[in-house]
Amino acid sequence: MSKVTPQPKIGFVSLGCPKNLVDSERILTELRTEGYDVVPSYDDADMVIVNTCGFIDSAVQESLEAIGEALNENGKVIVTGCLGAKEDQIREVHPKVLEITGPHSYEQVLEHVHHYVPKPKHNPFLSLVPEQGVKLTPRHYAYLKISEGCNHRCTFCIIPSMRGDLVSRPIGEVLSEAKRLVDAGVKEILVISQDTSAYGVDVKHRTGFHNGEPVKTSMVSLCEQLSKLGIWTRLHYVYPYPHVDDVIPLMAEGKILPYLDIPLQHASPRILKLMKRPGSVDRQLARIKQWREICPELTLRSTFIVGFPSETEEDFQMLLDFLKEARLDRVGCFKYSPVEGADANALPDQVPEEVKEERWNRFMQLQQQISAERLQEKVGREILVIIDEVDEEGAIGRSMADAPEIDGAVYLNGETNVKPGDILRVKVEHADEYDLWGSRV
């Protein structure tokens, strides 16, 4: 009787943003297709892959620590991802790393794995990989990456130097992936990229094909097509181009979720110019007003940076004034920190850490108040909620206004007869600064 050769085992660590998560899913899918077993522990693995983040200093530190832990626990480590674009920095701290590749270098990663842990003799029918691929998210939602890279040159950001200029995926390929996800039971698709609203710019919005039908390569056409799948579609990382106005009617018609994640970064024209970001705050406020008139249910999420080099109290006050007027629903705020390779590092008048901290606290205090007031308006109303978790105490879900992991939650105490992915109608009974509580209707 022939001896069964055990499958080679690969440990995997995925750090950073959802875009990195999608890269990890692609590598894992290829490994599983080739017959490798992916395991959760280092000591049981023949090798470990660490997919790193290198966007800000804290992310770099986390990545370096993860590499160090993998080396200590296992010894055979391949590094990929954004920090991989800075090989010298990794080698200086961890010279024993076997191989280093940059972001979206899937083929290189697989070649390195084949070199150190040869490909098994694999019968694909013994270990079927799901058609939608290996996913690191719960079964009921998934990220759909539509492009790679970015054409902007924001002075605080090094993404273009790590991931290159914008490269849009063919729209037929994107829509086919979306269909596979829905067929596999996904109820919510989160559209991501470095710059979602620029989708198709690099190919001059050429016409592609899906199911034999012509489809324009653009964000608006993509949203129109995704709306036909009968699931929740959520847009992330939307740069405030003029054509963003065109997706708001789709939200008002219920074709995609009335949710827009649009990083604005600041509200002082002077600071925005230093950041190389769009600078007309009055125009942005007018657009927000218009969007809400067209789609009253619209949820606006944004992120901002406080303590950017040379930011004065007057600049910061402009930001607070903008918050008061815009009354955004979901807001993240970061204290500026220098990122190696970013142009902003060379700007004069760096803001002291204690000033950054004080401004961040004032910013968050104001936004918490706004968020609490916005959520209080929902008390007594009925909303749709998608369930994420269920235990003996009840269920936790999200409304259309909440993206996974970054926004709030809806708590349904005592509601145990549901499962993740169920979409319920819920009456809101209570709210705080970030979350809602309610009961099933």
UniProtKB/Swiss-Prot annotation:
The protein's GO terms of the molecular function aspect are:
4 iron, 4 sulfur cluster binding; aspartic acid methylthiotransferase activity; metal ion binding; protein methylthiotransferase activity
* Domain TRAM residues, every copy: 376-441
Which NCBIfam families is this protein grouped with? 30S ribosomal protein S12 methylthiotransferase RimO (TIGR01125), MiaB/RimO family radical SAM methylthiotransferase (TIGR00089)
> Taxonomic lineage of this organism?
Bacteria, Pseudomonadati, Pseudomonadota, Gammaproteobacteria, Enterobacterales
Family indicated by similarity = Belongs to the methylthiotransferase family. RimO subfamily.
Q: What does this protein do?
A: Catalyzes the methylthiolation of an aspartic acid residue of ribosomal protein uS12.
Where would you find this protein in the cell? Cytoplasm
Q: Could you say which residues bind [4Fe-4S] cluster 2 here?
A: 150, 154, 157
Under the heading InterPro entries, the entry gives:
Elp3/MiaA/NifB-like_rSAM (IPR006638), Methylthiotransferase (IPR005839), Methylthiotransferase_CS (IPR020612), Methylthiotransferase_N (IPR013848), Methylthiotransferase_N_sf (IPR038135), NA-bd_OB-fold (IPR012340), Ribosomal_uS12_MeSTrfase_RimO (IPR005840), rSAM (IPR007197)
Q: Which SUPFAM superfamilies match?
A: Radical SAM enzymes
Statement: the UniProt record of this protein carries the keyword Oxidoreductase? no
Provide the species name. Answer: Shigella sonnei (strain Ss046)
Q: Which residues of this UniProt protein bind [4Fe-4S] cluster 1?
A: 17, 53, 82
Which cofactor(s) does the record list?
A: [4Fe-4S] cluster
Q: Which reaction does it catalyse?
A: L-aspartate(89)-[ribosomal protein uS12]-hydrogen + (sulfur carrier)-SH + AH2 + 2 S-adenosyl-L-methionine = 3-methylsulfanyl-L-aspartate(89)-[ribosomal protein uS12]-hydrogen + (sulfur carrier)-H + 5'-deoxyadenosine + L-methionine + A + S-adenosyl-L-homocysteine + 2 H(+)
* Protein name listed in UniProt: Ribosomal protein uS12 methylthiotransferase RimO
Q: Name one GO cellular component term.
A: cytosol
Q: Which UniProt keywords apply?
A: 4Fe-4S, Cytoplasm, Iron, Iron-sulfur, Metal-binding, S-adenosyl-L-methionine, Transferase
E.C. designation(s): 2.8.4.4
The note on cofactor binding and number reads: Binds 2 [4Fe-4S] clusters. One cluster is coordinated with 3 cysteines and an exchangeable S-adenosyl-L-methionine.
Which residues does the UniProt record annotate as the domain MTTase N-terminal?
8-118
One biological-process term from Gene Ontology? tRNA modification
Q: Which residues are in the Radical SAM core domain?
A: 136-373
Q: Which SMART domains match?
A: Elp3
